[in-house]
UniProtKB/Swiss-Prot annotation:
Residues 1-14, 70-98, 190-201 are periplasmic. Residues 36-48, 120-168, 223-238 are cytoplasmic. The chain crosses the membrane at residues 15-35, 49-69, 99-119, 169-189, 202-222. NCBIfam families: HEQRo_perm_3TM, PRK11123.1. This is Arginine ABC transporter permease protein ArtQ. The gene is artQ. SUPFAM superfamilies: MetI-like. One of its GO terms (cellular component) is plasma membrane. PANTHER family: ARGININE ABC TRANSPORTER PERMEASE PROTEIN ARTQ (PTHR30133:SF2), CATIONIC AMINO ACID TRANSPORTER, MEMBRANE COMPONENT (PTHR30133). It is found in: Cell inner membrane. Residues 11-223 form the ABC transmembrane type-1 domain. Pfam families: BPD_transp_1 (PF00528).
């Protein structure tokens, strides 16, 4: 029975990791969507290339790249290097004493990048689904472009994007299992530890599956409530 307390703590770590990645990922998704929609094509192509790379790589590789790449970056900054611009050379060096990187932070960064790569396409599609007439109506009312976007376009865009973003949240929850490879004490790592200690792997992995299922069902309920609230103006009164 004592084994359930570490599992409950690890489940909290999993949900916390997913929520942090969701918050950062949504901000990055909006940034990527704007980046890919830039009017200057080279800038838009650069954004599309980054999103394509993130979507094309296996999720496990992205997690490992961020984790080991962070350590390598700290070593490079500590050793120092020179940026040669031709007419001027810029030395770059930082005094770094601690080269340990936070597995939790690396997990959040990796998962948020993965979430943003897919969510940005959902946001772009949702933005295109808003009728152009909304912009024209806002201009007729004398609103500025920013006011039109935030007061007229964005609320409608989020309603279109909610189903897709909700599905990607469920995928994000499952992707949190990948961070066990970089020693984040999430549900999967704790389950593996308990299974090894008790020599009952099947039993404890079934328990972990049940916990993931409960989290998913709760997420679906919350997403349904959010969707009902967001679309309440579109439903006819009974």
């Amino acid at each position: 029975m004592n084994e359930f307390f570490p599992l409950a703590s690890a489940a909290g770590m999993t949900v916390g990791l997913a929520v942090c990645a969701l918050i950062v990922g949504l901000a990055l998704a909006m940034f990527f969507a704007v980046w890919e929609s830039a009017k200057w094509r080279p800038v838009a192509w650069a954004g599309s290339a980054l999103v394509t790379i993130l979507r094309g790589l296996p999720e496990i590789l992205v997690v490992l790249f961020i984790y080991f790449g962070s350590s390598q970056l700290l070593l490079t900054l500590s050793d120092g290097f020179t940026i040669n611009l031709g007419f001027v050379q810029i030395p770059v060096q930082m005094d770094i004493e601690n080269f340990d990187v936070s597995p939790f932070l690396c997990g959040v960064i990796a998962l948020s990048l993965l979430y943003a790569a897919y969510a940005s396409q959902t946001l772009r599609g949702a933005l295109k689904a808003v009728p152009v007439g909304q912009w024209e109506s806002g201009q007729a009312l004398g609103l500025s472009k920013s006011a039109i976007f935030f007061r007229l376009v964005m609320p409608q865009m989020w309603r279109h994007a909610l189903p897709g973003l909700g599905n990607q949240w469920l995928v994000l929850l499952k992707d949190t299992a990948l961070v066990s490879l970089i020693s984040v004490n999430d549900l999967m790592l704790q389950t593996k530890s308990i299974a090894t200690r008790t020599q009952e792997p099947f039993t404890w992995y079934i328990v972990a599956a049940a916990i993931y299922l409960v989290i998913t069902l709760l997420s679906q309920y919350i997403l349904k409530r959010i969707d009902l609230r967001a679309t309440r103006f579109e439903r006819r009164p009974s």
